[in-house]
Amino acid sequence: MSEKSRILILDDEKNYLLVLEALLSDAGYDVTPINDPEMAVSYLEEAEVDVVITDMKMPKMSGLDVLQQIKRSSPSIPVLIMTAFGSIESAVEVMKYGAFDYITKPFANDELLLSVHNAVELSRAHQQYRILQESLEERYSTHQIIGKSPAMRETLSIVDRV
């Protein structure tokens, strides 16, 4: 990894936070552990992260609630849901809401690392897409082709209103 990918881990169980933080830090990720869902949502409003890993069952707010909030504000961030109470029904439910993956506790380290790696790759692809899209918009926008003089801007403004 050239630049460390940023991973937010959300779990109300401190032992899992410690294990996940150690595992992912050792794998080269920049990890932010948070044990409160509301704090995590606030953190995401200010910070940029590449991937979120959240527990499903937590006090105050469920992992599904966190997932829904993330998908409303930052739909391109991959979210991995972890739970000790896994079922096919809950896996299908969170996937319908946009979860990237559903991992049951206890987890296999290799499985988790592979899922995180794939989520990071998706996040990077989204970032590259946004950069290319902005570059194309800047390169081929009409004001680049026509000009930036005040007279041309006024003319374009009139055209836009029509």
Per-region residue spans from a language model:
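Active-site residues of response regulator receiver
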Residues: 11, 55, 83
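Two-component/phosphorelay signaling modules centered on CheY-like receiver
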Residues: 14-32, 46
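Acidic, metal-coordinating helix/loop segments flanking the phosphotransfer/catalytic sites
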Residues: 33-51
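Acidic catalytic/metal-coordinating carboxylates
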Residues: 35-36, 62-65
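Receiver (REC) domain active-site loop signature in two-component systems and cognate sites
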Residues: 58
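A Lys-centered signature of the CheY-like receiver
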Residues: 97, 105, 148
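AAA+ ATPase active-site-proximal loops
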Residues: 133-162
